[in-house]
Swiss-Prot record:
<dbReference type="Pfam" id="PF12937">
    <property type="entry name" value="F-box-like"/>
</dbReference>
<feature type="compositionally biased region" description="Polar residues">
    <location>
        <begin position="1059"/>
        <end position="1076"/>
    </location>
</feature>
<feature type="domain" description="N-terminal Ras-GEF">
    <location>
        <begin position="1116"/>
        <end position="1244"/>
    </location>
</feature>
<dbReference type="InterPro" id="IPR008937">
    <property type="entry name" value="Ras-like_GEF"/>
</dbReference>
<feature type="region of interest" description="Disordered">
    <location>
        <begin position="1254"/>
        <end position="1279"/>
    </location>
</feature>
<feature type="domain" description="F-box 2">
    <location>
        <begin position="679"/>
        <end position="726"/>
    </location>
</feature>
<feature type="compositionally biased region" description="Low complexity">
    <location>
        <begin position="888"/>
        <end position="910"/>
    </location>
</feature>
<feature type="compositionally biased region" description="Gly residues">
    <location>
        <begin position="1264"/>
        <end position="1279"/>
    </location>
</feature>
<protein>
    <recommendedName>
        <fullName>Ras guanine nucleotide exchange factor G</fullName>
    </recommendedName>
</protein>
<feature type="domain" description="Ras-GEF">
    <location>
        <begin position="1317"/>
        <end position="1548"/>
    </location>
</feature>
<dbReference type="InterPro" id="IPR000651">
    <property type="entry name" value="Ras-like_Gua-exchang_fac_N"/>
</dbReference>
<dbReference type="Pfam" id="PF00617">
    <property type="entry name" value="RasGEF"/>
</dbReference>
<feature type="region of interest" description="Disordered">
    <location>
        <begin position="163"/>
        <end position="239"/>
    </location>
</feature>
<feature type="region of interest" description="Disordered">
    <location>
        <begin position="827"/>
        <end position="1101"/>
    </location>
</feature>
<feature type="compositionally biased region" description="Low complexity">
    <location>
        <begin position="943"/>
        <end position="957"/>
    </location>
</feature>
<keyword id="KW-0344">Guanine-nucleotide releasing factor</keyword>
<feature type="region of interest" description="Disordered">
    <location>
        <begin position="254"/>
        <end position="296"/>
    </location>
</feature>
Length: 1556
């Protein structure tokens, strides 16, 4: 009976005999069996026991990370740690899965000897820091093993992403991600008993299998991505290959890290990772050939993806996806279609896979084969004093029944921190290895290479030797350290004690090697039934022997392959044959890796050769010889390849060898004979694997294409929140360090304050119901006196109304008016009001009510907002008169007598008072919102300290005494329609005339009260006023208004925009974006108000004079000179402050002067995502009040930014907007469709709209003094030679084809243009100039990018315009100085002045200034005799033009001329003036402090807007290509040539008679 005290998490022992009785004893050994204690200091080790040989394998402990850091599938950015919740769930699962026997870990191993059965009992004690021990098998599992029932363990996914094992005894239900047709599955584990031998093995993380032919264990890599429940603590990291082969239907073929091939043999037990029993196991167990009747439970609900869907994928996406798959996956996809086959044949894809596999399967102590050739070799002195004892490794003492093993002293190199460490090996160890691989070939190779095996090599830092977890070694390595003993006794019980100590070999720079020899004591007890034997001490160190053997093999292979693959000489055929015959004794993975390393020749080797010679003399010879060796190794029948070796070989062949070459074909044929890899369909990839793949796709295009492949892929992308992750990744790229979130800025209002404020100004639903009831009662009370009045009016139709008589004022006209008011009260003219007369609409900024007595933000009083013209007259009657309804934007002015009493900030009382009876006051009702846009909270000053909420209480005082009636206003007869039915009686009716146009409702009666206001004045009147209306003149800004309504006159704290309610109430911007009309004034009864743009005065006969209401100036309205970025974005998207559209446009047009585009976009996205307040009452209420209005504001800014500044977007911003508009933005928002449409339009026209800058540049100016020379003309003006002169001379003209010296051209071309009419020349010059001017972007004028050489690329069009200006200037000088005769020069100057005159008539001031600058150049200005020859008419033209473009008075004459140009007329302004103004505005010396200056932005915007207006009006001249081409290639001379020729034409102190 074997008992194992297992404190390790990764110990597996396979079982080869039927299990007997199992006892549940902890740390108690059976007295009938001997105890073998194995002490292992490594926490994570895998030990396989076979015939007394113990081969522990050290693996790297990587903590409790979920994903493997070295797994290319789950990259480092996806790796994380277990959360406490995950650990709690894992512990709970362990408790449920384990019975009372918590520490039962019993396995039984039986071994067959020659005479009797020998029982080897191994008690393995592993040092582990964890105090808890967990069983390898639960009670239910053990009972199932003993009973022979099959157990299927299925991994179930828990919310934390871990996997746990649950036992199922039925095979009917299968997970959708599993497939029964595959042999190995990583998501399900099945432990089956062998039906022939009734043996069962259990697997936790590492599975083993026994091969009788080799008497060794087959170690496989773990297949579970996370530790099973049997682990006490999740300290195990998943295997690399297992994590990558996570799919439920992935075929896993012998995932052992060493050379184990599954060969058919008798009495063989294989514990593999199958999900179901199926007939495919026959490849691994030929004794089970009769098990073909096993049913497959493949899930047929998942159908393979059609080939056509894959054809829709892009090649780049293919390569990205395939880069995360293994070779078997690619081989399966390779057979899908020719298109995929061509893509998979991409060698770069396989090269990447090859590098991944090398990293995974390479040993950390691997020695690079080219190190000895590339780096200097240090001599070392091997001081081994135990060589004499090492030659007796295989000698057995058979006579005395004593085993004497003298193990080799191997120097292990574990000093990873020492740059000079290496793995040394003694001569005796070479002899031991030679003996183990055979006396014929192995010994000869060892003897020949003995002198080269102990050469120390510097540790290399190449990528293919990155330290990875050490995989288990193959059987041959175990055999090197096993003791071949012959047992003559009947019963032998071996007791092996292993001390795992690693000896490091440190090589000093001087080359001295210090060998630390380990003394390991092992005792073997031989007990006989008749007598007891003696104990013999053995020197054994398995760990050192394993590493030493590996390093020895490494060194031997390096030397052998260097000898067999030289560059010039030919290796011996006999030696090569001996090596091939014995190569199966080397680890197969190590052998293949060395051959591949040798094939990839580094360029540093023989670097003195040229590339061609190096390929011919070095690379190709070595590669051909390596290819031949590789083919022979593959064809060697004794060499068995494991899974990792096959991956390395296949990826290497596909990546580095041409598929059509004979070498590639031969290697592929050899691999097909060796072993066939089974593959799975890509459509069956599990959802977890799909999500892991998709998370590595960092492009919206890749995810979008994958989303359209199949419904399953679409679902995987949808449920994994990949779009949100991609959205956040893009935003992280725009984020700047040190940036404060806009919602965390203490200088701004918090969301809680905003919500509380809107909660105060909006009544609760109960109050709104009361308001509805009060409104209905009011309507009923209004109808009763109106009926009585109608009866009395029938008897008094012919009586004129007296001034003080209030009983005889009704007539037919008034009756019609009252009927119309009643219809408005009943809501008969409204769409949503119905016949009930009242319609409630909650405060929804996006859906205002239009019906009845509307309550809502867009309800316009009792009439719902419809305007009516009565009797064909021009007098407008507002629908809210007499209605009593109110809304957030309701209009309360009307034509009939209305008494209004304000009791609370949100209470408005209205009443219709008939003229024929006494005054009747209607009951008060409460309005849901104060009917004015000034109800919005005032802006707080942008200071670090947040101000407290402002009070909105309104107190009323007693009304003043009634004033006398003012003088009667008479209306001209022409103002009334002759067809009106009540024109004669209209004088008894008081009708208000709105001060705004008839298409715009009048302003509201209430405005916001300042915080410091404690009382207001309210006047009430019940008298009847007889007045007439006055016509509204379009040319007069002053209006006169008489009303009979009771109004509240309040001094506003700021102007609030009026409501431009044109019937469309879905746009939230009407709440705060539209400006109020300062000319509209509400007055008390019997008062005459004269409203103007500056002030309004209120007078009456009783000399009750109220102070004039002054309209505040725009410059004094809430102007914050300096603010930070958060305050600016808050101002642009505020729902509490009315933001002027000019400020928004100015900030968006000039934002690049203080921030970048990425910063602005990121701030707007921060503003869009509003953190939810903690004091909200309901989600719907929160969205309606705060979230939706702010998001709509942000979307408006986004739309403006996309429409006007899309060229400023980089690739990241464009991708971010794509994700935002497709997957993040609220699709129910009213501006979503507009925003998507604008973005799509810009995106589709991006390539076509960005035209290249026209290749028109000027010659390089060599003028001293910065190129700002000027000369005074005959008219007293002066012209700048280049535009840069206006800016300070910092601009340098660039050299181009126009600026070349035209000496190679024919002389006739100089006269071709001059011979044309001046008018035609001016037209063609204007067309060329406007083509450049129209391409200038607004962003080019910012930050003086045109004047700094480092930022020329930011203003290419301005630079093109400057170069063109300089070219024209030099061309004028060239064509004048070219002529030798004075008369000819005079004609050319006269022609140029005529051209300039025509340019002025075409408003082409830019080219005009260029010609005048050429005439004022020193080379031309000094030709006084030439200028004297000009005619007086031409001299007058020159004087006028020089005066126009003079710089005197800051270009006053030119500015005046430009201001008189018709805005619709085509014009090209002189850019020099604008550049000088922009330079002054953007000068940093004028900056008073840190922050954003809105005033400066407004000034910049005004200039940019002017330029944009000029760009909108192109010229309509006919274009002549030949003339245009000639004008584009103007001939110019250099400065030196111009000066030299000028001195030749008119030398100094010459006379006229001396000249021609």
């Amino acid at each position: 009976m074997d008992k194992i005290n297992n404190e390790n998490d990764k110990i597996n022992i396979s079982i080869k005999a039927p299990i007997g009785n199992i006892e549940d004893n902890n740390n108690n050994s059976n007295n009938n069996s001997n105890n073998n204690s194995v002490s292992n200091s490594n926490n994570n080790s895998s030990i396989s026991i076979n015939s007394g040989s113990n081969t522990p394998t050290n693996s790297k402990n990587r903590g409790i990370k979920i994903f493997d850091l070295d797994d290319p599938f789950t990259s480092k950015r996806l790796s994380g740690f277990f959360s406490p919740e995950s650990l709690a769930e894992l512990s709970k699962l362990q408790l449920n899965d384990t019975d009372n026997n918590d520490n039962l870990t019993t396995t039984t191993t039986t071994t067959t000897t020659t005479t009797t059965t020998t029982t080897t009992t191994n008690t393995i004690t592993s040092k582990n820091n964890s105090p808890n021990t967990s069983p390898l098998l639960s009670s239910t599992t053990i009972s199932s093993i003993t009973s022979g029932a099959p157990i299927k363990k299925r991994f179930e996914r828990i919310p934390s992403g871990l996997s746990h094992v649950t036992n199922h005894y039925d095979d009917d239900d299968d997970d959708e991600s599993s497939s029964s047709e595959e042999d190995f599955d990583s998501t399900e584990l099945v432990c089956r008993p062998n039906k022939t031998s009734s043996t069962t093995a259990t697997t936790t993380t590492t599975t083993t299998s026994v091969s009788p032919l080799t008497s060794s264990f087959v170690m496989r890599r773990p297949s579970s991505p996370s530790p099973p429940p049997s682990c006490s603590s999740p300290t195990l990291s998943p295997s690399l290959s297992a994590t990558r082969r996570l799919s439920g239907n992935l075929v896993k073929v012998a995932t052992d890290s060493d050379n184990q091939s599954l060969e058919p043999c008798n009495n063989k037990t294989i514990v593999d990772n199958n999900d179901n029993d199926n007939d495919n196991n026959n490849n691994h167990n030929n004794n089970n050939n009769n098990n073909n009747n096993n049913n497959s439970t493949e899930d047929i609900s998942i159908k393979p993806i059609c080939n056509k869907t894959f054809l829709d994928l892009d090649e780049k996406i293919y390569l990205k996806i395939f880069g995360y798959l293994f070779a078997e996956d690619l081989c399966s996809i390779n057979r899908v279609s020719k298109h995929l086959c061509n893509i998979i044949n991409n060698q770069q894809l396989w090269k990447d896979l090859f590098s991944i596999y090398i990293k995974i399967y390479s040993e950390p102590s691997d020695i690079y084969i080219w190190d000895e050739d590339l780096y200097s070799i240090y001599n070392n002195n091997n001081n081994n004093n135990n060589n004499n004892n090492n030659n007796n490794n295989n000698n057995n003492n058979n006579n005395n029944s004593n085993i004497s093993n003298n193990n080799n002293n191997i120097n292990n190199s574990n000093g990873n921190n020492n740059p000079y460490f290496t793995g040394g090996v003694s001569n005796s160890s070479i002899g031991a290895i030679g003996g183990s691989i055979g006396s014929s070939a192995g010994s000869n190779i060892a003897l020949k290479l003995r002198s080269n095996t102990s050469i120390p090599i510097i540790e290399r830092g190449r990528s293919n030797t990155i330290a990875m977890p050490t995989p288990t070694f193959i059987n041959e390595i175990n055999m090197l350290n096993s003791n071949n003993s012959v047992n003559n006794n009947n019963n032998i019980s071996n007791n092996n004690t292993i001390n795992s100590n690693n000896a490091g070999v440190i090589i000093n720079p001087s080359g001295t090697v210090n060998n630390n020899i380990n003394n390991i004591n092992s005792s073997n007890s031989i007990n006989s039934s008749s007598s007891s034997g003696s104990n013999i001490n053995l020197s054994n160190n398995n760990s050192s022997t394993i590493h030493g053997s590996y390093i020895s093999s490494n060194l031997i292979l390096n030397s052998v392959l260097r000898k067999f693959t030289p560059t010039t000489s030919v290796p011996s055929t006999n030696e090569v044959t001996d090596f091939i015959e014995s190569c199966h004794h080397f680890p197969s993975k190590l052998l293949i890796c060395k051959l591949v390393q040798r094939y990839l020749v580094p360029r540093e080797f023989q670097r003195h050769l040229s590339d061609i010679d190096w390929v011919k003399m070095v690379e190709r010879p070595i590669q051909l010889r390596v290819g031949k060796l590789l083919k022979k190794v593959i064809d060697q029948k004794k060499v068995n390849f494991d899974y990792g070796t096959m991956l390395i070989l296949r990826s290497f062949i596909r990546g580095y060898i041409q598929s059509t070459s004979d070498m590639a074909k031969g290697l592929i044929v050899g691999l097909q004979k060796k072993q066939v890899l089974k593959v799975f369909d890509i459509s069956r990839v599990s959802d977890i694997l799909l999500i892991k793949i998709f998370r590595n796709l960092d492009s919206i295009k890749d995810l979008s294409v994958c989303q359209r492949v199949s419904k399953r892929w679409n679902k995987a992308i949808a449920i994994s929140s990949l779009w949100e992750q991609l959205y956040l990744n893009y935003r992280k790229k725009l984020h700047h360090e040190g940036d404060i979130n806009i919602w965390d800025d203490p200088s701004l209002h918090t969301v809680e304050y905003l919500y509380e404020f809107f909660d105060q100004i909006q009544p609760s639903p109960q109050q709104q119901q009361q308001q509805q009831q009060q409104q209905q009662q009011q309507q009923q009370q209004q109808q009763q006196p109106q009926l009585q009045t109608n009866e009395s009016n029938n008897n008094n139709e012919d009586i004129k109304q007296n001034d003080n008589n209030n009983n005889n004022s009704n007539n037919n006209g008034l009756n019609n008016l009252q009927k119309l008011i009643e219809e408005n009260l009943e809501g008969s003219n409204l769409s949503n009001g119905g016949n009930s007369g009242s319609s409630f609409s909650p405060f929804n900024p996006l859906s205002g009510s239009n019906g009845g007595s509307s309550f809502g933000p867009f309800g316009s009083g009792g009439g719902g907002g419809s305007n009516s013209n009565i009797g064909g007259s021009s007098n407008q009657l507002n629908s809210s008169s007499g209605g009593g309804g109110s809304g957030f934007l309701a209009m309360a002015s009307g034509g009939s007598s209305v008494s209004s009493v304000t009791s609370t900030p949100s209470t408005i009382s209205t009443n219709c008072t008939p003229t024929g009876g006494s005054t009747t006051n209607s009951p008060n009702f409460q309005s849901p919102m104060v009917s004015s846009s000034t109800v919005l909270p005032p802006p707080i000053p942008f200071s670090p300290n947040l101000s407290s909420p402002r009070s909105m209480s309104i107190s009323l005082s007693s009304p003043p005494p009634l004033p006398n009636k003012p003088p009667e206003l008479k209306l001209p007869d022409s103002s009334l329609s002759p067809n009106s039915s009540f024109n004669n009686n209209l004088s008894s009716t008081s009708i208000s005339i709105p001060s705004t146009p008839t298409t715009t409702p009048s302003s509201s009666l209430l405005t916001f009260i300042p915080p410091n206001t404690t009382s207001t004045t309210t006047t009430t009147s019940t008298t009847n006023i007889t007045s007439t209306t006055m016509p509204i003149s379009a040319a007069t800004t002053t209006t006169t208004t008489t009303t009979s309504t009771t109004s509240t006159i309040i001094q506003p704290i700021q102007p609030i925009p009026p409501v431009n309610n044109n019937g469309s109430q879905s746009d939230l911007s009407k709440i705060s974006d539209l400006n109020a009309n300062p000319n509209t004034t509400t007055t008390t009864t019997t008062n005459t108000i004269e409203s103007s743009s500056s002030s309004s005065s209120i007078t009456n006969n009783n000399e009750n004079i109220i102070e004039p209401i002054k309209s505040p100036q725009p410059s004094m309205i809430n102007v914050q000179k300096l603010m930070n970025l958060n305050q600016l974005v808050d101002k642009l998207t505020s729902i509490t402050v009315a933001t002027e559209i000019s400020e928004v446009n100015a900030c968006l047009a000039t934002y690049r002067t203080f921030i970048s585009t990425s910063q602005l976009v990121e701030k707007l996205f921060q503003r869009y995502h509003i953190p939810r307040a903690s004091n909200i009452k309901s989600i719907l209420d929160w969205k309606q009040r705060i979230e939706t209005p702010i998001q709509v504001k942000v979307c408006k800014v986004f739309k403006k930014l996309i429409d006007d500044h899309f060229d400023d977007f980089n690739g990241t911003i464009i991708e971010l907007f794509k994700v935002f508009l497709l997957h993040i933005i609220d699709k129910q928002s009213p501006l979503t469709n507009h925003l998507i449409r604008s973005f799509s339009r810009k995106l589709s026209g991006e390539n076509g709209s960005t035209g290249s800058v026209i290749g028109i540049t000027g010659g390089k100016s060599s003028r001293k003094g910065g190129g700002s020379g000027s000369g005074s003309g005959s008219g007293g003006g002066s012209g700048s030679s280049i535009i840069g002169g206006a800016v300070g001379g910092t601009i340098k003209a660039s050299q181009s084809k126009i600026g070349r010296m035209m000496s190679v051209r024919k002389a006739q071309q100089f006269n071709d243009i001059i011979s044309l009419p001046a008018e035609e020349i001016a037209k063609q010059l204007t067309l060329i100039e406007f083509e450049i001017f129209g391409k200038i972007q607004s962003s080019e004028f910012l930050n003086q990018s045109w004047a700094k050489e480092k930022t020329f690329h930011l203003a290419p069009n301005i630079r093109a315009s400057i170069d063109r200006f300089n070219t024209v200037t030099k061309w004028v000088c060239t064509i004048i100085l070219k002529e030798e005769k004075i008369r000819t020069r005079t004609k050319i100057m006269s022609k140029l002045l005529k051209v300039a005159k025509n340019l002025r008539s075409y408003s082409n001031f830019h080219t005009l200034m260029a010609i005048l600058s050429g005439l004022n150049e020193i080379h031309i200005y000094r030709l006084k005799f030439t200028q004297q020859e000009l005619k007086p008419k031409i001299q007058k033209i020159s004087s006028e033009l020089q005066t126009l473009m003079s710089v005197e008075g800051n270009h006053e004459a030119y500015r005046t001329e430009l201001s008189n140009v018709d805005p619709k007329q085509s014009c090209i302004p002189y850019l020099g003036v604008y550049l000088k103004d922009l330079t002054f505005i953007q000068d940093d010396t004028n900056k008073k402090g840190d922050g954003i200056n809105i005033k400066q932005s407004l000034n910049l915007y005004n200039i940019l807007k002017t330029i944009q207006n000029f760009q909108k009006n192109p010229y309509s001249f006919e274009e002549f290509p030949k003339i245009k081409e000639t004008l584009l290639n103007l001939p110019v001379w250099t400065e030196d040539n111009l000066y030299r020729v000028s001195m030749q034409r008119e030398p100094r102190n010459c006379k006229r008679s001396d000249l021609i």
